[in-house]
């Protein structure tokens, strides 16, 4: 600045300026100068230039000469009051450098180090803001006028400076370049030696800028003072120093009050500890964490009172309370997109700091962030924070966590890392984008984890720019290692809108330029009614909604969709269509992202849809089973798959009643979200496939949706991501074979399987991996037409089953499945069948095996009889399965473990434990006991092996050729078909077993069906209360003994399978007895692992019995058994 003033005065040397330079400066700034500067602009520049040059003088190079940046009022302890712009000489610093002793003309004392700066630094200028992000600059200028500006240093590129200038409601950013000779310039024609000269020049002449630099943006927030006094090196405070005022809120462990620290007349926040809520040590851990962290966006600890109860934690006071309530109650025209992005950037900066300090927060959410003046946001509530000594932190048993904000690996394994905080940050970002909406609207807590497993993710909020939503989705990657770090997130915010402004992006998303206030309006009451109306329409025209909804939704809010948005908007509508069952169509608003509609309304719609959906889901399944004529049933199922894939309960949930519920409840809200997501994010070819399965109108709508599906995320946020072809076959096979209870279970697995092929990350998928493999084979590996065939076949099977009564249907359905099985070569057929069976039956191995030789004989007789449509479809499926065994095997090998990849450590430990096993004798006894408890797997396996040799085989083979090709095409490829056969009966599970190699036992027609039903029913009928912890533990011991015996004798592979089947059956029944949600999640994951391991053993029995290979397979099995045992014993 001094140089500028000298230039104005006409001096060529600093020394030429006398001690009365201030007079010269003011005169020079007020005096007209012969130049092309405008007098008005010069006078405006003088208003802020003259003050900043008050300290300029001969002593400018003195390193101890500083200038005050902010006002500071002394509060005792030898502190010194200073005013902005005042000169002072620094005499020394305290032990931590946070306070410095200074001398002014008013005296000597301590002042905060971050309140002063060297007199020759840029920070002394009101227009220089130091390291400030692009987003923060836009925020700081958001309330300015034309000509408001600031100069900032790039946070991402230190040393690189820019000018941010506001004009006509928009902020323009100009990079300050450095020439080879060291001179600075914005416009190459005008170069300057110093930054101050450059700023002064552009304050008088635009010279390439949109307008002149008139008004420096104020530095709004004073920096945090760490510690209330320079001598304050102990944290314990006197309780009498705090005056408690009114209550601000409460939490799990205590309450928060506003108080006054009398000694310093400072308003503070006082967090108290409830009596008997946790130990003092735990309470003090939070204070210990806060002592170690110092960041402008982290709430600062001031002291503690722990000498006697009640205990206090005293922190700085934030004027506007928690971020969640602030967002819900704020004026949305004031708290616009720029402010929201600024808030998110501040939080990411705080979390980046914690990441570098190796801290994890473990409770990051809008409710735990606080808001101060000028939209300052600080992360607070470190009650669950921990200093990391390794890559992960394991929470103690019984710890409580917010499910909707907790990463899946944390829910399943109690493992926390900075990556689990990243997941929570994604949810927090969604909260900010929706002005404080509750995450996963309409979805029950118990369903969140299952939906996430199925690759469901929340929809993009209305008006949310694509880049921001992509960042959310990146935070929600299933594998923790795939999520970005907070450093990357912060950098993403800094560079997110380099070529445009967020305001413009939001306007584009809303579909109307200049409608800035529309967002807040849309989010309010009117939306709810709209959603209701939408849902009604969707329900009334569910069959036709798929096609009309897309245009309809667009019409509502997308009247002027952007050219780049068409793909997105259709996707959103599609999602809405998915929800039609439960009123999901209400999501049409979501579809009009481009329109005014808000994410809130769409989510609310989904919620409403949820209530109707559960009933529809369950009713549709029942009707399908009992009413063959209901053609709509098939269509509904197809929709359910797309919408309700999420809804399907995991195989883990043994309770039949439970499985329907999840499918309903989850399916509706999730389905809505999912379908929309599915349509939006799925690829067009997948949509086409699915369309074939569903009614023609559905197909049309889906195809359209596929075309418009969103660009970046192939999978929808929801489970709907499952390939359509796969999903269709899956739901059919599942629904057909089992009653509602079993159906829910099987359905779930198959659906997941379909997902899995496309989305390897999904954990649940392993449970249905086999099934998924089958589905994927039909849909992915073969041409799309294969998928169609499968779909058609499934329809036929469905019809047959529905038409025939439980008694009559078995003969027709059974004979053909049996024939197919027989047709498969004994040796090769078994593996293929097993693969097919895997998907259909978890533990169905027993069901398949249960088919006795007698039943085989029975089947042989009926096998010769005329084939019903169901039989033919089954035969075709069987044929397809035999043809694609290689493919199936490959897929099986690729299957990922169901649980999230979270803590690798847990898996390693489990793997190591498998080596330990009880004595062989004990194992033998345990095996026997297990056999008595459930259908004997050994017999089933043996019978399966023997079956191929039986004459029934020959019959079966002829049957395959006899079936017309067109029909076989319909069933194309899903080995699942056997499962569908028993759909009307509980024996559905047995049908699944039939898919396995043991399926050769299917020779008996009616008798087989009966035996299968019996085999499957016992596990299904077991009341959850009947299976106790002891039963499960005994079963795990039995399996360990069987494995130990097998490893030594290299025999009795079937005994291991049988023991595993028994354990699986008991676990599925026991899962509902687990009360703690987190343990239930982990137990389901363990069941999925067990199921996958058993399938692998069934598919490749040879490897299990061959030396090292067998050991490896059993190691995985033992690992899952150990995990189950650990969870049960918690």
UniProtKB/Swiss-Prot annotation:
Site description Breakpoint for translocation to form BCR-ABL and NUP214-ABL1 fusion proteins, residues in chain: 26-27
Gene3D superfamilies (UniProt xref): Nucleotidyltransferases domain 2, Phosphorylase Kinase, domain 1, SH2 domain, SH3 Domains, Transferase(Phosphotransferase) domain 1
Active site: 363
Keyword ATP-binding included in the entry's annotation: yes
A Gene Ontology term for the protein's cellular component: ruffle
Cofactor: Mg(2+)
Low complexity bias locations: 905-915, 984-993
InterPro entries from the UniProt entry: ABL_SH2, F-actin-binding, Kinase-like_dom_sf, Non-receptor_tyrosine_kinases, Prot_kinase_dom, Protein_kinase_ATP_BS, Ser-Thr/Tyr_kinase_cat_dom, SH2
Disease: Leukemia, chronic myeloid: A clonal myeloproliferative disorder of a pluripotent stem cell with a specific cytogenetic abnormality, the Philadelphia chromosome (Ph), involving myeloid, erythroid, megakaryocytic, B-lymphoid, and sometimes T-lymphoid cells, but not marrow fibroblasts.
Function in brief: Non-receptor tyrosine-protein kinase that plays a role in many key processes linked to cell growth and survival such as cytoskeleton remodeling in response to extracellular stimuli, cell motility and adhesion, receptor endocytosis, autophagy, DNA damage response and apoptosis. Coordinates actin remodeling through tyrosine phosphorylation of proteins controlling cytoskeleton dynamics like WASF3 (involved in branch formation); ANXA1 (involved in membrane anchoring); DBN1, DBNL, CTTN, RAPH1 and ENAH (involved in signaling); or MAPT and PXN (microtubule-binding proteins).
Name of the protein in question: Tyrosine-protein kinase ABL1
């Amino acid at each position: 600045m001094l140089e500028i003033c000298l230039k104005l005065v006409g001096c060529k040397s600093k020394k030429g300026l006398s001690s009365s330079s201030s007079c010269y400066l003011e005169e020079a700034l007020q005096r007209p100068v012969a130049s092309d500067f405008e007098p008005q602009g010069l006078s405006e520049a003088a208003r802020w230039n003259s003050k900043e040059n008050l300290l300029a003088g001969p002593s400018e190079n003195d390193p101890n000469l500083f200038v005050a940046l902010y006002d500071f009022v002394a509060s005792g302890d030898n502190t010194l009051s200073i005013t902005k712009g005042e000169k002072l000489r620094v005499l020394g610093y305290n032990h931590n450098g946070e306070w410095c002793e200074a001398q002014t003309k008013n005296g000597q004392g301590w002042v905060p180090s971050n309140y002063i700066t060297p007199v020759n630094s840029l920070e002394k200028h009101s227009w220089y803001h130091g390291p400030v992000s692009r987003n923060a600059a836009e925020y700081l200028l958001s309330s300015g006028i034309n000509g408001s500006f600031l100069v900032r240093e790039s946070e991402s590129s230190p040393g690189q400076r820019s000018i941010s200038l506001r004009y006509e409601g928009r902020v323009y950013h100009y990079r300050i370049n450095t020439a080879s000779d060291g001179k600075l310039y914005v416009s190459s024609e005008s170069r300057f030696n110093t930054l101050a000269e450059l700023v002064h020049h552009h304050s008088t002449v635009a010279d390439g800028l949109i307008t002149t630099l008139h008004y420096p943006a104020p530095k709004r927030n004073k920096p945090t003072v760490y510690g209330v006094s320079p001598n304050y090196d102990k944290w314990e405070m006197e309780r009498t120093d705090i005056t408690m005022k009114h209550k601000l809120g409460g939490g799990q462990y205590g309450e928060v009050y506003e108080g006054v620290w009398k000694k310093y007349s400072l308003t503070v926040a006082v967090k108290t500890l409830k009596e008997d809520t946790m130990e003092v040590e735990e309470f003090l851990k939070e204070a210990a964490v806060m002592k170690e962290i110092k960041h402008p966006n982290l709430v600062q600890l001031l002291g503690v009172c722990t000498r006697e109860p009640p205990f206090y934690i005293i922190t700085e006071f934030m004027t506007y309370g928690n971020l969640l309530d602030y967002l819900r109650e704020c004026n949305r025209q004031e708290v616009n997109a720029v402010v929201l992005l600024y808030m998110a950037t501040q939080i990411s900066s705080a979390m980046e700091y914690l990441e570098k300090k190796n801290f994890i927060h473990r409770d990051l959410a809008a409710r735990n962030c606080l808001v101060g003046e000028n939209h300052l946001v600080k992360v607070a509530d470190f009650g669950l924070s921990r200093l990391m000594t390794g890559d992960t932190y394991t929470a103690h048993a019984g710890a409580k966590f917010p499910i909707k904000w907790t990463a899946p690996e944390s829910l399943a394994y109690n493992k926390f890392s900075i990556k689990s905080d990243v997941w929570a940050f994604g949810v927090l970002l969604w909260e900010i984008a929706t002005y404080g909406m509750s995450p996963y609207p309409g979805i029950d807590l118990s369903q969140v984890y299952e939906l996430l497993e199925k690759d469901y993710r929340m929809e993009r909020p209305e008006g949310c720019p694509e880049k921001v939503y992509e960042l959310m989705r990146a935070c929600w990657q299933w594998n923790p290692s795939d999520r970005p770090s907070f450093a990357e997130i912060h950098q993403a915010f800094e560079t997110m809108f380099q070529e445009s402004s967020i305001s413009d992006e939001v306007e584009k998303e809303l579909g109307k330029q200049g409608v800035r206030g529309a967002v807040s309006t849309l989010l309010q009451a009117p939306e709810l009614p709209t959603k209701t109306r939408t849902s009604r329409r969707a329900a009334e025209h569910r069959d036709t909604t798929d096609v009309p909804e897309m245009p309809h939704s667009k019409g509502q809010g997308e009247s002027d969709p952007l050219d780049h948005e068409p793909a997105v908007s259709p996707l959103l509508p599609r999602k809405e269509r998915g929800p039609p069952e439960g009123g999901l169509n209400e999501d049409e608003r979501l579809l009009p992202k481009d329109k005014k509609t808000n994410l809130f309304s769409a989510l609310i719609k989904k919620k409403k849809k949820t209530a109707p959906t559960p009933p529809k889901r369950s009713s549709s399944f029942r009707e399908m089973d009992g009413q063959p004529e209901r053609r709509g049933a098939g269509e509904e199922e197809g929709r359910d798959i797309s919408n309700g894939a999420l809804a399907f309960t995991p195989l883990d949930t043994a309770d039949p009643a439970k499985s329907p519920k999840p499918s309903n409840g989850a399916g509706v809200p999730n389905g809505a979200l999912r379908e929309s997501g599915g349509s939006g994010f799925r690829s067009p070819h997948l949509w086409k496939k699915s369309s074939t399965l569903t009614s023609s109108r559905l197909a049309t709508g889906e195809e359209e949706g596929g075309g418009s599906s969103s660009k970046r995320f192939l999978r929808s946020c929801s489970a709907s991501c499952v390939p359509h072809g796969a999903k269709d076959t899956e739901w059919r096979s599942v629904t057909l074979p089992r009653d509602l209870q079993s159906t829910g279970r099987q359905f779930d697995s198959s659906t997941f399987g379909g997902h899995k092929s496309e989305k390897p990350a999904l954990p649940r998928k392993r449970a249905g991996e086999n099934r998924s493999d089958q589905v994927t084979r039909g849909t992915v590996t073969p041409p799309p037409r294969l998928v169609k065939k499968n779909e058609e076949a499934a329809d036929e099977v469905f019809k047959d089953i529905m038409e025939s009564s439980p008694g009559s249907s078995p003969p027709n359905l059974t004979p053909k499945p049996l024939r197919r099985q027989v047709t498969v070569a004994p040796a090769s057929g078994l593996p293929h069948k097993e693969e097919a069976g895997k998907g259909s039956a978890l533990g169905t191995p027993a069901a398949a095996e249960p088919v006795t030789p007698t039943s085989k004989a029975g089947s042989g007789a009926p096998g010769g009889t005329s084939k019903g449509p169901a039989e033919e479809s089954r035969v075709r499926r069987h044929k397809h399965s035999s043809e694609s065994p290689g493919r199936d095997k490959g897929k099986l090998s690729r299957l990922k473990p169901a649980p999230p990849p979270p803590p690798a450590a847990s898996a390693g430990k489990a793997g190591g434990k498998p080596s330990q096993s009880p004595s062989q004798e004990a194992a033998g006894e345990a095996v026997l006991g297990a056999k008595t408890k459930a259908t004997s797997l050994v017999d089933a396996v043996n019978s399966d092996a023997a079956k191929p040799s039986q004459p029934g085989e020959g019959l079966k083979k002829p049957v395959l050729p006899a079936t017309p090709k067109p029909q076989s095409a319909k069933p194309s490829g899903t080995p699942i078909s056997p499962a569908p056969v028993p759909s009307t009966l509980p024996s559905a599970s047995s049908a699944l077993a039939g898919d396995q190699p043991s399926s050769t036992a299917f020779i008996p027609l009616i008798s087989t069906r009966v035996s299968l039903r019996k085999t499957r029913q016992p596990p299904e009928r077991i009341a959850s209360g009947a299976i106790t912890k002891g039963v499960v533990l005994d079963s795990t011991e039995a399996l360990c003994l069987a494995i130990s015996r097998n490893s030594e004798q290299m025999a009795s592979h079937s005994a291991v399978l049988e023991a595993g089947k028994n354990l699986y059956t008991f676990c599925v029944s026991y899962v509902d007895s687990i009360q703690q949600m987190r343990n239930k999640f982990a137990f389901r994951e363990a069941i999925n692992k067990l199921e996958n391991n058993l399938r692998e053993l069934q598919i490749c029995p040879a490897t299990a019995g061959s030396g090292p290979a067998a050991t490896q397979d059993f190691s995985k099995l033992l690992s899952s058994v150990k995990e189950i045992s650990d969870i049960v014993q918690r």
